């Protein structure tokens, strides 16, 4: 049996969006669980997602007032999934923002931060960059579903992801929500 898990990040409601796009319900049709990798901004986002499936979430750099952990591990069908936003610490966040504003964006740095957060996991899910990404570091699947909220420099459009987990092995797919 294959278990479907919805993966979402960087919703930024109501900071950048008034509400979640309606395409999320269709994208997450049939999922048993939704993992939110932070920058939620409002608990009503988790309530709305919770009408689709149970939600596990972590705090992002824009979630100062939400009482959520910065990272956690979830086990689904024998697959250990590390969930983090990916900004590491406030000090690192501000240093990286400065670097980016000076034209030194480095996706590898954020992937390293996310993967260094966990030991002994099969999948690491992160957000923060607003850039969809799917790669392996050794045997560990690194997956960033991109962002739901509009972004000032990304042209991929809003995206979420779905993990298909069978016998402890996860496959990830990116799901565009349309503009």
Where are these regions (language model features)?
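Short, flexible, glycine/charge-rich loop motifs used to bind or transfer phosphoryl groups or to couple energy/partner
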Residues: 22-26, 45-48, 71-72, 111-115, ...
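Beta-strand-turn-beta hairpins that frame and shape the catalytic cleft
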Residues: 1-6, 73-83, 136-142, 165-173
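Active-site neighborhood of phospho(di)ester-bond hydrolases with catalytic His/Asp-centered motifs
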Residues: 7-9, 33-39, 56-61, 83-85, ...
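Extended active-site neighborhood of metal-dependent phosphoesterases/phosphodiesterases
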Residues: 47-82, 115
């Amino acid at each position: 049996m294959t278990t479907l898990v919805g993966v979402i990040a960087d919703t930024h409601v109501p900071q950048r969006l008034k509400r979640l796009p309606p395409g999320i319900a269709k994208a997450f049709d049939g999922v048993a669980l939704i993992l939110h990798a932070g920058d939620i901004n409002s608990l009503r986002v988790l309530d709305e997602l919770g009408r689709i499936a149970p939600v596990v979430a972590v705090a992002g750099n824009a979630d100062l007032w939400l009482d959520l952990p910065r990272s956690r591990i979830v086990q689904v069908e024998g697959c250990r999934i590390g969930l983090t936003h990916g900004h590491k610490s406030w000090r690192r966040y501000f240093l990286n923002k400065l670097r980016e504003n000076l034209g030194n964006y480095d996706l590898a740095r954020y992937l390293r931060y996310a993967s260094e957060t966990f030991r002994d996991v099969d999948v690491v899910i992160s957000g923060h960059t607003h850039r969809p990404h799917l790669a392996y570091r050794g045997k560990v699947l690194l997956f960033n579903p991109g962002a739901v909220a509009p972004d000032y420099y990304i042209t991929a459009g809003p995206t979420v992801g779905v993990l298909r987990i069978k016998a402890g092995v996860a496959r990830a797919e990116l799901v565009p929500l349309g503009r």
